[in-house]
């Protein structure tokens, strides 16, 4: 069990959601187990699998054992671990249905923007986060996000998704969150993209910022954050930071064992800066950075220094 935003949530459960539109016939034969509210019910499929179903009025005047009309089903939530189903049902039952709807719409929007699959846990974690953020707002307890600047710079698409969520919440609920909350939501999306824990995502973001600060200090220059080369550097640093937590390294896949030495000769300043980054990572995190990694980073640093304003 993990303490998540003041609630006990088992993040080890395998959680997934299926759009009914993509599995229409799988919804046939669902029978009500328990009505959670007018728009959410727990149900049992013909094969005995317990699910949670969302749809406008799907629980209205329904009772245990009744078959759910297919046309009322909008979403079907399935947990691969049956013992964890109660946990999700309790979460859904404890919040107004519009908050689950908002979370689901934000996730669907994120999938479209990013054009990639997200970790299924996002339905659990983001719903809980939005619900808790609203509760804090109602209690006049608003907190800033110390990583706002970094999230804006490093995760632009995810931050845009966060602002979409804030706009949706304001339109639906009349609650206007500060932009810090967009950054918090963005970090949840990043978690789901790379299947990392929130603590790791925060640390990865700080590593990227620390490396950029080191680069700025080494070259005594400001980086052009609007350039394509800067975007490529951020992407490279993001994967480098993620490898710290997966204990992975980049090995030479060029077929040229002399690649690092060649880069050192061609880009000596960038290579030395890259070695400073290597020393920082190895000293701070105990993660070994290969010479190939040093060389690839040096190439990105050269691009950043020479390709401004792309």
Identify the function of each model-found stretch.
Residues 11:
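Acidic, metal-dependent phosphodiester-chemistry machinery of nucleic-acid enzymes
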Residues 2-3:
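Intrinsically disordered, low-complexity segments enriched in serine/proline and basic residues
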Residues 15-310:
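A cross-family "folded-core" feature that marks the main globular domain of proteins
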């Amino acid at each position: 069990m993990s303490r998540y935003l003041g609630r006990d949530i088992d993040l080890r459960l395998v959680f997934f959601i299926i759009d009914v539109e993509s599995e229409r016939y799988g919804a046939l034969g669902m029978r009500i187990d328990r009505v959670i509210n007018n728009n959410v019910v727990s149900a049992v499929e013909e094969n005995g699998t317990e699910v949670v179903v969302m749809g406008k009025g799907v629980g209205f005047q329904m009772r245990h054992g009744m078959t759910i009309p297919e046309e009322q089903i909008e979403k079907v939530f399935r947990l691969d671990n049956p013992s964890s189903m109660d946990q999700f049902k309790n979460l859904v039952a404890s919040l107004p249905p519009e908050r689950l709807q908002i979370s689901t719409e934000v996730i669907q929007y994120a999938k479209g923007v990013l054009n990639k699959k997200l970790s299924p846990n996002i339905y659990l974690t983001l719903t809980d986060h939005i619900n808790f953020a609203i509760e804090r707002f109602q209690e006049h307890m608003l907190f800033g996000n110390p990583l706002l600047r970094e999230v804006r710079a490093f995760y632009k698409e995810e931050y845009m998704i966060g602002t979409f969520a804030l706009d949706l919440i304001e339109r639906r609920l009349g609650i206007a969150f500060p932009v810090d909350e967009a950054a918090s939501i963005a970090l949840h999306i990043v978690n789901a993209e790379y299947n990392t824990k929130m603590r790791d995502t925060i640390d990865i973001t700080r590593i990227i910022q620390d490396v950029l600060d080191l680069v700025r200090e080494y070259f005594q220059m400001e980086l052009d954050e609007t350039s394509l080369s800067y975007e490529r550097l951020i992407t490279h640093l993001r994967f480098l930071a993620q490898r710290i937590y997966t204990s992975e390294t980049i090995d030479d896949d060029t077929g040229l064992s002399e690649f690092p030495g060649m880069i050192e000769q061609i880009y000596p300043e960038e290579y030395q800066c890259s070695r400073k980054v290597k020393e920082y990572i190895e000293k701070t995190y105990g993660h070994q950075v290969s010479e190939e990694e040093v060389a690839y980073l040096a190439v990105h640093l050269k691009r950043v220094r020479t390709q401004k304003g792309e």
